[in-house]
């Protein structure tokens, strides 16, 4: 039977839920392709000793991948879930001198004022859709713009609503064109979609249909 609604409910303030989610969401080969793409773009945009901010760092999978391959960068991971930050802190222990953890709600709290500058890149994966609406995503894009150094990059790998989908998608899963329009209106340079992953139109699950969006300040 086809899925009429595509979305998921989370309880990230629960330690038990966060641990279970982290175990289920270990990066697959397909998801690692997204990490590879993000890393490739960051090597062009971030100086060797630059600073990266991750929005919604979750259990630290992307952070671990990047810190392993970028041995001199500083990293700030932001998440509203204390249990997720605890999981990430344990996973990233060997990188501890280079990592700062910040607990904040990306929409309701001025996290950008707590981030050490300059920031050369802001990244996020499978997180901003959980904000629930295009307006909330726009708020985060605006705050990211004010945080980035001139020439800095924003890279968002997140679940999207495919243009040909007939199902109802949760509010934070928006069209690629909507992401690009928002970034353009906020003053970003050259907003674009780098790639789309795990496309499924007939019977999509909540873990399919995601894209990598990028823009510069």
Q: Model regions: which residues?
A:
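A short glycine-rich, Lys/Arg-flanked "PGG" loop and its adjoining helix->strand segment in the class I
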Residues: 138-150
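A conserved beta-strand element that flanks and buttresses the S-adenosyl-L-methionine
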Residues: 123
């Amino acid at each position: 039977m086809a899925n009429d609604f595509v979305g998921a409910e989370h309880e990230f303030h629960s330690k038990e839920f966060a641990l279970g989610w982290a175990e289920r969401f270990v990066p697959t080969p397909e998801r690692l392709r997204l990490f590879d793409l993000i890393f490739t773009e960051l090597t062009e945009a971030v100086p060797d000793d630059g600073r990266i901010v991750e929005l919604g760092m979750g259990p630290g999978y992307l952070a671990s991948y990047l810190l392993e391959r970028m041995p001199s960068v500083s990293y700030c991971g932001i998440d509203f879930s204390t249990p997720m930050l605890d999981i990430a802190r344990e996973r990233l222990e060997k990188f501890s001198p280079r990592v700062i953890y910040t607990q904040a709600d990306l929409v309701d709290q001025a996290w950008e004022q707590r981030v050490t500058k300059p920031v050369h890149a802001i990244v996020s994966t499978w997180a901003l859709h959980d904000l629930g609406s295009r307006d909330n995503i726009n708020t985060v894009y605006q705050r990211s713009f004010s945080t980035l150094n001139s020439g800095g990059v924003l890279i968002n790998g997140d679940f999207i609503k495919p243009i040909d989908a007939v199902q109802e998608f949760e509010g934070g899963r928006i069209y690629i064109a909507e992401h690009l329009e928002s970034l353009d209106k906020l003053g970003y340079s050259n907003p674009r979609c780098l790639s789309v992953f795990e496309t499924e139109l007939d019977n999509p699950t909540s873990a399919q249909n995601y894209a990598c969006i990028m823009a510069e300040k």
